[in-house]
Amino acid sequence: MKIMLDAGHSYNTVGKRSPDGMREYEFNRVVANYMKALLEEYEGVTVYFSHSDKKDVSLQERTDKANQLAVDCFVSIHANAYGSGWNEAQGIETYVYKTKPPEATKLAERVQKNLIVATGLRDRGVKSANFHVLRATKMTAILVECGFMTNQSELQLLRSDLYRKTCAEAIVKGIREHFQLKLKSPDQLQKQESLFHVRIGPFFEKKQAEELMTRLRGIGYEASVQEG
């Protein structure tokens, strides 16, 4: 099974940030990274990213990539906002395309339920919208709004690594339930751990290593720089 994770927007998308300056993409990309690690523990699952830490990937590029790879599921991760200033808008909501395709709606309902149970935030329900990533994708697609950046209490959560992990785990649980995914055996996990570590280098300048790390992360690899 092929799953594409879409961390909405980018570091430089205009307006997609909290009133005090947190970029939405900061939350979105971390949740996507946690989800990728969790999903790869299931049999037959391959995870792709539509986004990049290096550049702002257009909506069309994202959906074109998903369609070209013929992924089975597309999940767009977001933090919500109401206006540009602080307000009391709150809660979590999950979207499907406006025609409400049954398969996407069922997935959205499972994801929404797990997010509400895991976070305790207000349940804003499953809704429909004409978002590009839902309209232009040819597979089961949902878009999740994990709390409001314009609500000061929820912004504190969105900044928390624990909350980001909680959201990732809840979304993955919904995906697992919907597609009836099975965990890999301990032997498979051990084999995966030992076979897919690649060391690239050395580099004499740290900047060069970090630039390559950024490119690798942008195409979906878990990359890091080690000194010594």
Task: Name each model-derived stretch.
Residues 184-228:
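Solvent-exposed beta-strand motifs enriched in subsets of small alpha/beta binding domains
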Residues 8:
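Extracellular repeat turn/loop positions enriched in glycine and acidic/polar residues, especially those
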Residues 2, 11-13, 19-190:
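Active-site-proximal helix/loop segments of hydrolytic enzymes
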